[in-house]
């Protein structure tokens, strides 16, 4: 029985190490190559293979600065200054989770969200949060802030099977993300808490309020050069 437990434990440890190796090697490759698919995209495709994934890569310099400012105003105003983790946000999330007795808030930065989108799944759990932390730590040490934001903008979800700001700009406005106005950029950034719902509820009061807040603060955010 003891030998069996040891074997199971070794298999478990080996599996964890293989996952870390997969994440590490993927991050090495994506330092210089476009990210053409993510775990979130795969999950969407597996759930309904008849629905195509809409995704188009756009280089950092070809994305409107309006959107860069808007996405950071909405998701991670301290992005340029932290090393992957916003400890004030995490502290607030822990307090809320303790109050509720379950994971209801994440306090996630752009880097953490990207790690989740690339490698993990959406269901909240402490195990997923732990793996997200490891992947974020690796990413922040291997990629520049510019690269992290570039990949994030190209892989984040904006609606059902709709990924990346270029696909979103074409879908919502019939134009490239290169020419998004402040209003348009703020609207797209405001979608992110619940893009599949807001896709069909564009006049939702919470969405419109969030858009106004982003417009108010987007000029104060600092973006990577």
From Swiss-Prot:
Main location as per UniProt: membrane
Biological-process GO terms, alphabetical: cell wall organization; peptidoglycan biosynthetic process; regulation of cell shape
TM annotation in the entry: 8-28
Catalytic activity annotation: [GlcNAc-(1->4)-Mur2Ac(oyl-L-Ala-gamma-D-Glu-L-Lys-D-Ala-D-Ala)](n)-di-trans,octa-cis-undecaprenyl diphosphate + beta-D-GlcNAc-(1->4)-Mur2Ac(oyl-L-Ala-gamma-D-Glu-L-Lys-D-Ala-D-Ala)-di-trans,octa-cis-undecaprenyl diphosphate = [GlcNAc-(1->4)-Mur2Ac(oyl-L-Ala-gamma-D-Glu-L-Lys-D-Ala-D-Ala)](n+1)-di-trans,octa-cis-undecaprenyl diphosphate + di-trans,octa-cis-undecaprenyl diphosphate + H(+)
SUPFAM superfamilies tied to this protein: Lysozyme-like
Keywords carried by this UniProt record: Cell inner membrane, Cell membrane, Cell shape, Cell wall biogenesis/degradation, Glycosyltransferase, Membrane, Peptidoglycan synthesis, Transferase, Transmembrane, Transmembrane helix
A GO MF label: pentosyltransferase activity
Membrane topology reported for the UniProt record: Single-pass membrane protein
EC number: 2.4.99.28
GO CC term, one of those recorded: plasma membrane
Cellular localisation: Cell inner membrane
Pathway the protein acts in: Cell wall biogenesis; peptidoglycan biosynthesis
Family from the record: Belongs to the glycosyltransferase 51 family.
Biological role stated in the UniProt entry: Peptidoglycan polymerase that catalyzes glycan chain elongation from lipid-linked precursors.
Xref: PANTHER family: BIOSYNTHETIC PEPTIDOGLYCAN TRANSGLYCOSYLASE (PTHR30400:SF0), MONOFUNCTIONAL BIOSYNTHETIC PEPTIDOGLYCAN TRANSGLYCOSYLASE (PTHR30400)
Name of the protein described by the UniProt record: Biosynthetic peptidoglycan transglycosylase
């Amino acid at each position: 029985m003891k030998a069996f437990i040891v074997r199971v434990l070794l298999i478990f440890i080996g599996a964890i190490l293989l996952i870390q190796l997969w994440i590490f090697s993927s991050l090495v490759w994506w330092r210089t190559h476009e990210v053409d698919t993510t775990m979130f995209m795969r999950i969407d495709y597996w759930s309904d293979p008849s629905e195509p994934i809409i995704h188009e890569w756009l280089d950092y310099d070809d994305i409107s600065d309006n959107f860069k400012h808007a996405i950071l105003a909405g998701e991670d105003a301290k992005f340029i200054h932290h090393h992957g983790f916003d400890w004030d946000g995490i502290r607030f999330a822990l307090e809320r989770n303790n109050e509720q007795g379950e994971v209801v808030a994440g306090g996630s930065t752009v880097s953490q969200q990207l790690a989740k989108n690339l490698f993990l799944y959406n269901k909240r759990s402490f195990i997923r949060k732990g793996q997200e932390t490891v992947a974020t730590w690796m990413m922040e040490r291997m990629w520049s802030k510019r690269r992290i934001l570039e990949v994030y903008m190209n892989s984040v979800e904006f609606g059902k099977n709709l990924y990346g700001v270029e696909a979103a700009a074409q879908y919502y406005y019939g134009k490239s993300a290169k020419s998004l106005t402040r209003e348009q950029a703020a609207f797209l950034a405001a979608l992110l808490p619940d893009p599949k719902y807001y896709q069909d509820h564009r006049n939702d009061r919470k969405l419109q309020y969030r858009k106004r807040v982003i417009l108010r603060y987007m000029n104060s955010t600092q973006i990577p050069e």
